[in-house]
Amino acid sequence: MRMSQLFGQTLREAPADVEVTSHKMLLRAGCIRQLGTGIFSYLPIGWRAVEKISAIIRQEIERIGGQELLMPVVNTADIWKDSGRWDVIGPELTRFKDRQERDLVLAMTHEEAVSDLVRQEIRSYRQLPRLVYHLQTKWRDDPRPRAGLIRVRQFIMKASYSLDRDEALLDLQYDRHFEAYHRIFARCGLDVLAVKSDVGMMGGKVAHEF
């Protein structure tokens, strides 16, 4: 397709209030446009880039045994109340009611939904280990969205959920993911450093950021 036929336009200059270089480049190249605070539309050329990255992620996670699924963006409040995070997480978790006055949430993460699914599908330890993952639209009402796509309220996140018989297998799966992420970054042409980080509300023994 010719550039002249693409939906969306390139910009000679980024808006004056845009400070981060990556944000400026994405706007000027016609990859994204802002709809609201921390909310962006991906134009065709930007979405093609997202799909190429997603394909690399899928290949590398399925290489270590991952099976892709898709979870609902809207979750029932019951599963969040059962986990205790309904009361722990503040206004970042968007809560609302349906027409039947039932409490619902826009999922900012999917541990609760996956746990509910596992209770239905896994009946014996003999079915383990299993590894499921998704590339999912999520919503977190961040109080300070900034820096373009670096810190947004609606975002696409890849998450894996490792179901293991014991902690040793869980540690092995963590190591496999660690290596898979390095391969993903390498295939995207990125040099990265892995830094140990706080586990945060996810819990666990160890976490890394790249």
Region spans (language model):
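TRNA-recognition modules of translation machinery and tRNA-sensing kinases, especially anticodon-binding
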Residues: M1-E209
